[in-house]
Amino acid sequence: MNIHEYQGKEVLRKYGVSVPEGKVAFTAEEAVESAKSLSSSVYVVKAQIHAGGRGKAGGVKIAKSLDEVKAYAEELLGKTLVTHQTGPDGQVIKRLLIEEGCDIKKEYYIGLVLDRATSRIVLMASEEGGTEIEEVAEKTPEKIKKAVIDPAVGLQGYQAREIAFAINIPKELVGKAAKFMLGLYKAFVEKDCSIAEINPLVVTGDGNVMALDAKLNFDSNALYRQKDIMEYRDLDEEDPKEIEASKYDLSYISLDGNIGCMVNGAGLAMSTMDIIKHYGGEPANFLDVGGGATAEKVTEAFKIILSDQNVKGIFVNIFGGIMKCDVIAEGVVEATRQVGLTLPLVVRLEGTNVDLGKKILSESGLNITSAESMADGAQKIVSLV
């Protein structure tokens, strides 16, 4: 689950992580009142959407008066902001963060991520702050410093200091930088984060080390024990199809293609998308119905896929282990009848009760194309759309 920047800073502040003073505003009038409450003559007006790249897209403004704060707030609120992370449709700005301006001397990058290779949290840092870390990794990977953290003892002070020295934090501020990293790590672990990115971390003219931006993502599987984080959820920033899918325990992620996919198992779902791409198609979604899908669940999955106007065909790829092929077949037939499906539909079944499943499909009288293998199914759906 993602949250807004201002919410992330609220979380970090509780862990002693230094962040600029700021307030959220939903109207231009609130923006002015927020600015008035800050002890600063320079203000930063920041669009709050669940996407990066806001600065380059014009979503961050520097205001030197209350009149400018109001003008920028009126300009941004209600505007659709398009960044490299939003896609071409962009996201509508519904709230702003009004912050005090900072005297920035140098920008850095600090991030905590889960490293699947080591099954540990890794602290990453770079003196190339303010730019995309992916860009730094591609062009100057030697500028990214890492520390692998032992989960038994957590991030140690010496590791934080080593990282601070490695990215050339001024010597007199290494202690503050280390304290910052230790607070960030504590927040990461206690709040079940999957990503914590501070870009940029800044050193200010008055000798402070603070997070100028904060991106926190949380493990959705752990939210049951993070009630306070759940309160930060902003459904307006989420895909309505993904919200609907979650009601039925379906794992759905919308993509940009035109071939809808319904698969059981995350690994098979990713392989299905790969093979569609291999044969020249473009998947419209990732959809994992899981191992305990019922006919009702399959029907809802179909409805969610078809709510995407870009979908021109559907590929159902099921390997029945726990899942029974006849249950899937019944769900496919029921869903096809309920929604009045007119798009090409290719179904590949394999595993438990596969013969019964194929029989149900063939005797349904519906226009369903059967596939003998995953490759066969991918080629057929690509040729039909």
Curated annotation (Swiss-Prot):
GO terms of biological process kind: succinyl-CoA metabolic process; tricarboxylic acid cycle
Cofactor note text: Binds 1 Mg(2+) ion per subunit.
UniProt xrefs under SUPFAM superfamilies: Glutathione synthetase ATP-binding domain-like, Succinyl-CoA synthetase domains
A single MF term (Gene Ontology): ATP binding
Q: Which UniProt keywords apply?
A: ATP-binding, Ligase, Magnesium, Metal-binding, Nucleotide-binding, Phosphoprotein, Tricarboxylic acid cycle
Q: Does the keyword Ligase apply?
A: yes
Record-level GO cellular component terms? cytosol; succinate-CoA ligase complex
Query: Looking at the record's lineage, which domain of life comes first?
Result: Bacteria
UniProt: substrate binding residues: N264, G321, I322, M323
State the function annotated in the UniProt record. Succinyl-CoA synthetase functions in the citric acid cycle (TCA), coupling the hydrolysis of succinyl-CoA to the synthesis of either ATP or GTP and thus represents the only step of substrate-level phosphorylation in the TCA. The beta subunit provides nucleotide specificity of the enzyme and binds the substrate succinate, while the binding sites for coenzyme A and phosphate are found in the alpha subunit.
Provide the protein name: Succinate--CoA ligase [ADP-forming] subunit beta
